[in-house]
Amino acid sequence: MKKEEKINYFWKYVLLTVGGILILIPLMVTVFSSFKKTKDIMNHFFAFPNPITLDNYKRLLADGVGGYFWNSTVITVLSVLVVMLFIPAAAYSIARNMSRRKAFNIMYSLLILGIFVPFQVIMIPITVMMSKLGLANMWGLIILYLTYAIPQTLFLYVGYIKLSVPDSLDEAAEIDGADKLTTYRKIIFPMLKPMHATTLIINALWFWNDFMLPLLILNKDSSMWTLPLFQYNYSGQYFNDYGPSFASYIVGIITITIVYLIFQKHIIAGMSNGAVK
Protein backbone atom coordinates (compact mmCIF):
# COMPACT_ATOMS: atom_id res chain seq x y z
CA MET A 1 0.00 0.00 0.00
CA LYS A 2 1.33 3.43 -0.96
CA LYS A 3 2.09 6.07 1.65
CA GLU A 4 -0.68 8.34 0.36
CA GLU A 5 -3.25 5.52 0.61
CA LYS A 6 -2.13 4.76 4.17
CA ILE A 7 -2.64 8.40 5.13
CA ASN A 8 -6.11 8.38 3.57
CA TYR A 9 -7.06 5.22 5.45
CA PHE A 10 -5.73 6.71 8.68
CA TRP A 11 -7.87 9.83 8.39
CA LYS A 12 -10.92 7.77 7.41
CA TYR A 13 -10.57 5.69 10.58
CA VAL A 14 -10.02 8.84 12.66
CA LEU A 15 -13.19 10.44 11.27
CA LEU A 16 -15.21 7.24 11.74
CA THR A 17 -13.93 6.88 15.30
CA VAL A 18 -14.75 10.48 16.18
CA GLY A 19 -18.19 10.15 14.57
CA GLY A 20 -18.85 6.91 16.46
CA ILE A 21 -17.90 8.53 19.76
CA LEU A 22 -20.12 11.54 19.11
CA ILE A 23 -23.06 9.18 18.49
CA LEU A 24 -22.39 6.60 21.21
CA ILE A 25 -21.75 8.95 24.13
CA PRO A 26 -25.18 10.67 24.00
CA LEU A 27 -26.83 7.27 23.48
CA MET A 28 -24.93 5.81 26.44
CA VAL A 29 -25.87 8.79 28.64
CA THR A 30 -29.54 8.39 27.66
CA VAL A 31 -29.56 4.66 28.49
CA PHE A 32 -27.74 5.14 31.80
CA SER A 33 -29.91 8.10 32.84
CA SER A 34 -33.12 6.18 32.20
CA PHE A 35 -32.12 3.84 35.06
CA LYS A 36 -31.05 6.60 37.48
CA LYS A 37 -32.84 8.81 39.94
CA THR A 38 -32.84 12.48 39.00
CA LYS A 39 -30.42 13.44 41.78
CA ASP A 40 -27.94 10.84 40.49
CA ILE A 41 -28.31 12.21 36.95
CA MET A 42 -27.49 15.70 38.19
CA ASN A 43 -24.54 14.62 40.34
CA HIS A 44 -23.03 11.85 38.19
CA PHE A 45 -24.19 12.51 34.63
CA PHE A 46 -21.80 10.15 32.80
CA ALA A 47 -21.55 7.46 35.49
CA PHE A 48 -23.05 3.97 35.32
CA PRO A 49 -26.34 3.86 37.28
CA ASN A 50 -25.74 2.82 40.88
CA PRO A 51 -28.17 1.72 42.10
CA ILE A 52 -30.18 0.73 39.03
CA THR A 53 -33.82 1.75 39.35
CA LEU A 54 -36.89 1.01 37.23
CA ASP A 55 -38.93 3.79 38.82
CA ASN A 56 -38.70 5.96 35.69
CA TYR A 57 -40.25 3.23 33.54
CA LYS A 58 -42.92 2.51 36.16
CA ARG A 59 -43.88 6.19 36.12
CA LEU A 60 -44.08 6.11 32.33
CA LEU A 61 -46.47 3.16 32.44
CA ALA A 62 -48.55 4.89 35.11
CA ASP A 63 -48.73 8.02 32.95
CA GLY A 64 -50.11 6.06 30.00
CA VAL A 65 -47.11 5.73 27.69
CA GLY A 66 -48.58 2.49 26.35
CA GLY A 67 -51.44 4.33 24.66
CA TYR A 68 -49.13 6.77 22.89
CA PHE A 69 -46.84 3.91 21.90
CA TRP A 70 -49.86 2.16 20.38
CA ASN A 71 -50.89 5.29 18.47
CA SER A 72 -47.41 5.59 16.94
CA THR A 73 -47.37 1.89 16.09
CA VAL A 74 -50.78 1.99 14.34
CA ILE A 75 -49.93 5.12 12.36
CA THR A 76 -46.49 3.84 11.33
CA VAL A 77 -47.59 0.30 10.40
CA LEU A 78 -50.66 1.38 8.39
CA SER A 79 -48.75 4.12 6.57
CA VAL A 80 -45.86 1.81 5.68
CA LEU A 81 -48.18 -0.99 4.52
CA VAL A 82 -50.10 1.29 2.16
CA VAL A 83 -46.87 2.77 0.78
CA MET A 84 -45.43 -0.71 0.19
CA LEU A 85 -48.65 -1.93 -1.43
CA PHE A 86 -49.26 0.80 -4.01
CA ILE A 87 -46.07 2.74 -4.78
CA PRO A 88 -44.00 -0.24 -6.10
CA ALA A 89 -46.81 -1.04 -8.56
CA ALA A 90 -47.00 2.58 -9.70
CA ALA A 91 -43.21 2.74 -10.03
CA TYR A 92 -43.18 -0.46 -12.12
CA SER A 93 -45.79 0.94 -14.50
CA ILE A 94 -43.95 4.26 -14.85
CA ALA A 95 -40.51 2.67 -15.29
CA ARG A 96 -41.75 0.37 -18.04
CA ASN A 97 -43.65 3.07 -19.98
CA MET A 98 -41.77 6.34 -19.50
CA SER A 99 -39.42 5.63 -22.41
CA ARG A 100 -42.34 4.92 -24.78
CA ARG A 101 -45.07 7.29 -23.64
CA LYS A 102 -44.53 10.96 -22.88
CA ALA A 103 -47.48 11.06 -20.47
CA PHE A 104 -45.68 8.75 -18.04
CA ASN A 105 -42.60 10.98 -18.12
CA ILE A 106 -44.72 14.01 -17.32
CA MET A 107 -46.56 12.14 -14.56
CA TYR A 108 -43.28 10.99 -13.01
CA SER A 109 -41.78 14.48 -13.14
CA LEU A 110 -44.84 16.00 -11.47
CA LEU A 111 -44.93 13.37 -8.73
CA ILE A 112 -41.29 13.72 -7.72
CA LEU A 113 -41.51 17.52 -7.65
CA GLY A 114 -42.67 17.12 -4.07
CA ILE A 115 -39.08 16.36 -3.08
CA PHE A 116 -38.16 19.98 -3.77
CA VAL A 117 -41.07 21.64 -1.93
CA PRO A 118 -40.06 22.71 1.62
CA PHE A 119 -42.56 21.61 4.24
CA GLN A 120 -42.57 25.10 5.79
CA VAL A 121 -44.13 26.50 2.60
CA ILE A 122 -47.26 24.35 2.86
CA MET A 123 -47.36 23.83 6.64
CA ILE A 124 -50.09 26.37 7.46
CA PRO A 125 -52.36 25.65 4.43
CA ILE A 126 -52.18 21.91 5.15
CA THR A 127 -53.14 22.43 8.80
CA VAL A 128 -56.11 24.65 7.92
CA MET A 129 -57.28 22.31 5.14
CA MET A 130 -57.18 19.18 7.32
CA SER A 131 -59.07 20.98 10.08
CA LYS A 132 -61.82 22.15 7.71
CA LEU A 133 -62.14 18.65 6.22
CA GLY A 134 -62.58 17.14 9.68
CA LEU A 135 -59.33 15.19 9.30
CA ALA A 136 -57.45 16.58 12.29
CA ASN A 137 -57.04 13.04 13.58
CA MET A 138 -54.95 9.90 13.11
CA TRP A 139 -56.52 9.11 9.73
CA GLY A 140 -55.72 12.58 8.48
CA LEU A 141 -52.14 12.17 9.65
CA ILE A 142 -51.85 8.85 7.80
CA ILE A 143 -53.17 10.48 4.60
CA LEU A 144 -50.54 13.22 4.90
CA TYR A 145 -47.76 10.70 5.46
CA LEU A 146 -48.83 8.76 2.37
CA THR A 147 -48.89 11.95 0.33
CA TYR A 148 -45.45 13.08 1.45
CA ALA A 149 -43.96 9.58 1.02
CA ILE A 150 -44.84 9.38 -2.69
CA PRO A 151 -42.06 11.56 -4.24
CA GLN A 152 -38.99 10.03 -2.59
CA THR A 153 -40.29 6.46 -2.52
CA LEU A 154 -41.36 6.59 -6.16
CA PHE A 155 -38.00 8.07 -7.16
CA LEU A 156 -36.10 5.24 -5.46
CA TYR A 157 -38.31 2.46 -6.87
CA VAL A 158 -38.24 3.77 -10.44
CA GLY A 159 -34.46 4.10 -10.35
CA TYR A 160 -34.06 0.60 -8.94
CA ILE A 161 -36.40 -1.00 -11.49
CA LYS A 162 -34.73 0.71 -14.45
CA LEU A 163 -31.29 -0.36 -13.23
CA SER A 164 -31.84 -3.82 -11.76
CA VAL A 165 -35.00 -5.30 -13.31
CA PRO A 166 -34.53 -5.76 -17.09
CA ASP A 167 -37.40 -5.58 -19.58
CA SER A 168 -36.48 -9.06 -20.81
CA LEU A 169 -38.15 -10.53 -17.71
CA ASP A 170 -41.48 -9.07 -18.80
CA GLU A 171 -41.00 -10.40 -22.31
CA ALA A 172 -40.15 -13.89 -21.05
CA ALA A 173 -43.20 -13.90 -18.76
CA GLU A 174 -45.43 -12.76 -21.63
CA ILE A 175 -44.15 -15.60 -23.82
CA ASP A 176 -45.05 -18.02 -21.01
CA GLY A 177 -48.60 -16.67 -21.00
CA ALA A 178 -48.46 -14.46 -17.91
CA ASP A 179 -50.43 -11.21 -17.89
CA LYS A 180 -49.06 -7.93 -16.49
CA LEU A 181 -50.54 -8.43 -13.02
CA THR A 182 -49.14 -11.95 -12.70
CA THR A 183 -45.74 -10.79 -13.96
CA TYR A 184 -45.63 -8.03 -11.37
CA ARG A 185 -46.92 -10.17 -8.50
CA LYS A 186 -44.81 -13.29 -9.08
CA ILE A 187 -41.65 -11.94 -10.71
CA ILE A 188 -41.13 -8.20 -10.31
CA PHE A 189 -42.35 -7.63 -6.75
CA PRO A 190 -40.13 -10.35 -5.21
CA MET A 191 -37.11 -8.94 -7.09
CA LEU A 192 -37.62 -5.57 -5.38
CA LYS A 193 -36.78 -6.99 -1.95
CA PRO A 194 -33.74 -4.71 -1.32
CA MET A 195 -35.80 -1.66 -2.22
CA HIS A 196 -38.72 -2.87 -0.08
CA ALA A 197 -36.38 -3.03 2.92
CA THR A 198 -34.88 0.37 2.12
CA THR A 199 -38.16 2.22 1.71
CA LEU A 200 -39.65 0.43 4.69
CA ILE A 201 -36.93 1.59 7.06
CA ILE A 202 -36.70 5.11 5.60
CA ASN A 203 -40.44 5.68 5.87
CA ALA A 204 -40.83 3.87 9.19
CA LEU A 205 -38.06 6.00 10.73
CA TRP A 206 -39.75 9.14 9.46
CA PHE A 207 -43.30 8.19 10.49
CA TRP A 208 -42.19 6.95 13.92
CA ASN A 209 -39.94 9.89 14.82
CA ASP A 210 -41.88 12.71 13.17
CA PHE A 211 -42.87 15.52 15.50
CA MET A 212 -44.05 18.44 13.39
CA LEU A 213 -47.03 16.88 11.59
CA PRO A 214 -48.49 15.27 14.76
CA LEU A 215 -48.01 18.61 16.54
CA LEU A 216 -50.01 20.40 13.84
CA ILE A 217 -52.71 17.75 13.32
CA LEU A 218 -53.15 15.96 16.67
CA ASN A 219 -52.16 18.48 19.33
CA LYS A 220 -55.75 19.38 20.31
CA ASP A 221 -56.67 15.82 21.34
CA SER A 222 -54.16 14.26 23.74
CA SER A 223 -55.74 10.80 23.33
CA MET A 224 -54.39 10.69 19.74
CA TRP A 225 -50.86 11.89 20.54
CA THR A 226 -47.98 9.95 19.06
CA LEU A 227 -44.93 9.02 21.13
CA PRO A 228 -42.78 12.03 20.04
CA LEU A 229 -45.64 14.40 20.86
CA PHE A 230 -46.06 12.72 24.26
CA GLN A 231 -42.30 13.03 24.87
CA TYR A 232 -42.41 16.74 24.06
CA ASN A 233 -45.23 17.42 26.51
CA TYR A 234 -43.82 14.97 29.07
CA SER A 235 -40.43 16.71 29.11
CA GLY A 236 -42.22 19.98 29.75
CA GLN A 237 -44.32 18.43 32.51
CA TYR A 238 -41.30 16.89 34.25
CA PHE A 239 -38.75 19.53 33.30
CA ASN A 240 -36.90 19.21 36.63
CA ASP A 241 -37.29 15.44 36.78
CA TYR A 242 -35.09 14.10 34.00
CA GLY A 243 -35.31 10.36 34.73
CA PRO A 244 -38.78 9.75 33.24
CA SER A 245 -37.93 11.89 30.21
CA PHE A 246 -34.83 9.82 29.45
CA ALA A 247 -36.86 6.63 29.90
CA SER A 248 -39.41 7.88 27.36
CA TYR A 249 -36.60 8.44 24.84
CA ILE A 250 -35.43 4.85 25.25
CA VAL A 251 -38.96 3.55 24.65
CA GLY A 252 -38.99 5.43 21.34
CA ILE A 253 -35.48 4.43 20.30
CA ILE A 254 -35.55 0.71 21.00
CA THR A 255 -38.51 -0.15 18.75
CA ILE A 256 -37.27 1.51 15.58
CA THR A 257 -33.73 0.24 16.27
CA ILE A 258 -35.01 -3.35 16.21
CA VAL A 259 -36.74 -2.70 12.86
CA TYR A 260 -33.55 -1.22 11.44
CA LEU A 261 -31.40 -4.15 12.59
CA ILE A 262 -33.79 -6.62 10.94
CA PHE A 263 -33.63 -4.94 7.52
CA GLN A 264 -30.19 -3.29 7.53
CA LYS A 265 -28.47 -5.82 5.24
CA HIS A 266 -30.79 -4.86 2.36
CA ILE A 267 -30.62 -1.09 2.79
CA ILE A 268 -27.23 -0.34 1.19
CA ALA A 269 -28.05 -2.26 -2.00
CA GLY A 270 -31.43 -0.63 -2.29
CA MET A 271 -30.16 2.92 -1.75
CA SER A 272 -27.14 2.61 -4.06
CA ASN A 273 -29.14 1.13 -6.94
CA GLY A 274 -32.31 3.16 -6.47
CA ALA A 275 -30.59 6.55 -6.55
CA VAL A 276 -28.55 5.93 -9.70
CA LYS A 277 -31.24 6.90 -12.24
UniProtKB/Swiss-Prot annotation:
Q: Does tRNA processing show up as a keyword for this record?
A: no
Database matches in PROSITE patterns: ABC_TM1
Main localization (coarse)? membrane
Which spans are transmembrane here?
13-33, 74-94, 110-130, 141-161, 198-218, 243-263
Q: Where in the cell is it found?
A: Cell membrane
InterPro entries, from UniProt? BP-dep_ABC_trans_perm (IPR050901), MetI-like (IPR000515), MetI-like_sf (IPR035906)
Which residues belong to any copy of the ABC transmembrane type-1 domain? 69-263
A single BP term in Gene Ontology: transmembrane transport
Listed CDD domains: TM_PBP2 (cd06261)
Keywords, in A-Z order: Cell membrane, Membrane, Sugar transport, Transmembrane, Transmembrane helix, Transport
- Got a GO cellular component term for this one? plasma membrane
How does the UniProt record describe the way this protein sits in the membrane?
Answer: Multi-pass membrane protein
Summary of the function given for this chain in its UniProt record? Involved in a binding protein-dependent transport system responsible for the uptake of melibiose, raffinose and isomaltotriose.
Similarity-based family: Belongs to the binding-protein-dependent transport system permease family. MalFG subfamily.
For this entry, the protein name equals Multiple sugar-binding transport system permease protein MsmG
Source organism phylogeny: Bacteria, Bacillati, Bacillota, Bacilli, Lactobacillales
